[in-house]
C-alpha cells in the first residue's frame, strides 16, 4: 500500500559539505522510479479517487500526461491498477532517453497506455491541451461516465505533497539542531517548469521561514532569465537532463 511505500524509504533530508560550506540536501529520489516526482505521484492517484467519490458521483478519471521522460514513468507507476482511473502518457519519440522509453513501454498495469508522438515535448503538451479543450471529446467521456484530469504540474494535487516535504525538511533541520525554530533558510531548486520551486513559495506563504528562492537552471534558462529580465523567451533547446528538458 501507499503507506508501505513511504515507510520503507529513508528520511529524505541529507547533509553534505561543498567547498567547506554545509548544505542540507533533500534526497527526493527514493521512490519506485527514482524521480523526485514520485513524492507527489505516489499519493496523487489516491487524492484523485477520493475527490471523484465526493464530487463527481463515482465517475472514472482519464489521466492525460505529456512527458519528456521522468514524469511519464512516475505517473504510470503511481496510477497503475488504481480503481476508477485510466492513464495515457504521450512522449516525443526522439525526445526521451532509451532508458525512459523502455521504462514507459514496459510499464505494467491494466489501466495504462503509452503513446509516442512526432515532435518535441511542447508538441506533446500542446496536443494534450487540445484534447482537454475539445468539447466533442469531453462529451464522449461524459456519456461514458468519465472525465479528464492531468498528472502534470498544472494539477494542484502535484504541488500539495511538494509543499509538505519543504515543511518536513525544515522541521528535520530544527530537530537536528541545524537551525532554530523561526530561522530563515534559502531554498535552491534545479527547475525546468517552476513547479517544484513554486511549492516552496506556497510553503512560505503558509508560514515557512524562507529567505531566498534560488532558481537553478542550465542552458534551458527561460525561468532564471524571466526572473532577471521580465522577458519570457520562446526557444527550443535540447539537453540531456530529463527533469529540466523542456521545449521552451
Residue spans of the language-model regions?
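N-terminal entrance/gating region of PLP-dependent enzymes' catalytic architecture
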Residues: 1-34
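Short, small-residue-biased leader/transition segments that mark boundaries at the very start
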Residues: 2-6, 241-243, 248
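Well-ordered mid-protein domain cores that form the structural environment of catalytic cofactors
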Residues: 24-81
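A conserved active-site cap/scaffold subdomain adjacent to cofactor or substrate pockets
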Residues: 185, 189-236, 240, 244-246
